[in-house]
Each structure stands twice: as C-alpha cells, then as structure tokens.
UniProtKB/Swiss-Prot annotation:
EC numbers for this chain: 7.1.1.9
Catalytic activity: 4 Fe(II)-[cytochrome c] + O2 + 8 H(+)(in) = 4 Fe(III)-[cytochrome c] + 2 H2O + 4 H(+)(out)
Protein name: Cytochrome c oxidase subunit 3
Source organism phylogeny: Eukaryota, Metazoa, Ecdysozoa, Arthropoda, Hexapoda
InterPro entries: Cyt_c/ubiquinol_Oxase_su3, Cyt_c_oxase_su3_dom, Cyt_c_oxidase-like_su3, Cyt_c_oxidase_su3-like_sf, Cyt_c_oxidase_su3_a-hlx
Principal place of residence: mitochondrion
Keyword Membrane: yes
Length: 262
C-alpha cells in the first residue's frame, strides 16, 4: 500500500524505538538475572533507563501522530481498540496460568508440603488487614477512573482532571502498601510452592499496577495539555480498560490466594 494513496490507514514511518525497546528489555532481564544471583545491579539499572527513555520517545511520537498530525482516523482507532482488547485477553491467559499453578498445588498438597495448605511452617497473611485495604483502594480507583471517563465524555475538563489525579494517587498508595507487605512478609519466594505462587501472582499483578499507573499518568499529562476531546480520547480509554482489568485480577487474587488460600 502506497504511503501517498488516498486511504484512511496510518502507515507508520521508520522508527528506532522498537529496536531500542528490545535492547532495553533484553538488558533489563539480563540485569535482573545477575541481580538475583547476587551480582551488581548496574546492568538492570541501565536496562531500565534505556526502556524508560524509549517509552518516553515512542509515546511522544504516538501522541504527536494522533493529536497534531491527525493520523489516528476512525479505521485506525478501530484497529487500536482491537489491539488493546487482544492484548488484555492475552494478559488474562497469562494470569490464568498463575491461578492454575496455585490451585493445582493447593487443592492437592503433596507429602513434602505436609499434605496441608498453607504448607507446614508458612505463616500466611491476614486477609483482613493490608490485603483488604488494598482491595478497597483498587475498587475506589475503579470508581474514580470511571468518573474521569464520564467527565471527559461530557467535556468536563476539571472533573476529568480530578478523577485521573485521584486514580493515580490511589494506584501509588496501593503500590506502597504492597511494597510494605513484601518487606514485612514472614516468608520468601524460596519458601516452597506457596512462596513461589504467591510472589509470582501478586508480584506480576503489582508490576501491572505500576504499568497502569504510568499509563494513567501519561493520560493525565496529556489531558491537562488538552490532547483529549469527548470524541477523540482512545489513549485514555485504553488506560481505563487496562485499569479495570488490573482491578478484576486483584479481586480474584484476593479471594483465592489471600482469603481462601490462607
């Protein structure tokens, strides 16, 4: 398809960001493995810096193309919507694998675990302390992001700003409480299959909360610079979908791992 043809599709220009993003991801994971084996964190930090700089530059280009160059036409937006939907579906299956591992281990605990769940020697978290507070925080953030979305659709700039701001604050609050919970935890990822499944599932969810908070922060900065209108705000809509997904996953985590699993 010619770049100069009369069609509504966005044919992207050559970009270095996929390559630098791949280099950043590879460097980050390599550095993480080094860090896990008690080596220096230098490579991990370098990978994070490359990834963050790539994200900034890439998102800047996408914002420019969609907002100022008008390249995100209706057919392009439909494609972006389907892309986001399929991405969230892939993430759902990603978390299903963690739940599968958890229930496989907990419903028929082996002799090595003492044939009980949680395994002998594991002191599980009280589900009615920090985990319950985190549940309330995420549910409240789901309400505030919906408030922001409806305000945006009604062209109410100030209320959309407030809703986004409170959602970001609640996301940061959740991450701080989860970090505190990890620091105070009476077991580690090395403590049998309970520790492995617990930290894998809740840790990856925590990572998704950080990603979602960053996504919403970008939307907040774009919103206060008037990049969104009531008819053209897919970037925000994608962030809201992602946040609701994170919210629902946490409910399943809380009910199965924290409450039932304790």
């Amino acid at each position: 398809m010619s770049a100069h043809a009369n069609h509504p599709f966005h044919l992207v220009d050559y970009s270095p960001w996929p390559l630098t993003g791949a280099i950043g991801a590879m460097t980050t994971v390599s550095g993480l493995v080094q860090w896990f084996h008690q080596y220096t964190m230098t490579l991990f930090i370098l990978g994070n810096i490359i990834t963050i700089l790539t994200m900034y530059q890439w998102w800047r280009d996408i914002s420019r193309e969609g907002t100022f160059q008008g390249l995100h036409t209706f057919p392009v937006t439909i494609g972006l919507r389907w892309g986001m939907i399929l991405f969230i579906v892939s993430e759902i299956f990603f978390f299903i694998s963690f739940f599968w591992a958890f229930f496989h281990s907990s419903l028929s605990p082996t002799i090595e675990l003492g044939m009980t769940w949680p395994p002998v020697g594991i002191i599980a978290f009280n589900p009615f302390q920090i985990p319950l507070l985190n549940t309330a925080i995420l549910l409240a953030s789901g309400v505030t992001v919906t408030w922001a979305h409806h305000a945006l659709m009604e062209s109410n700039h100030s209320q959309a700003t407030q809703g986004l701001f409170f959602t970001i604050v609640l996301g940061i609050y959740f991450s701080i409480l989860q970090a505190y919970e990890y620091i105070e935890a009476p077991f580690t990822i090395a403590d049998a299959v309970y520790g492995s499944t617990f930290y894998m599932a809740t840790g990856f969810h925590g990572l998704h909360v950080l990603i979602g908070t960053t996504f919403l922060l970008i939307c907040f900065l774009r919103h206060i610079n008037f990049h969104f209108s009531k008819n053209h705000h897919f970037g925000f809509e994608a962030a809201a979908w992602y946040w609701h997904f994170v919210d629902v996953v946490w409910l399943f985590l809380y009910i199965s791992i924290y409450w039932w699993g304790s």
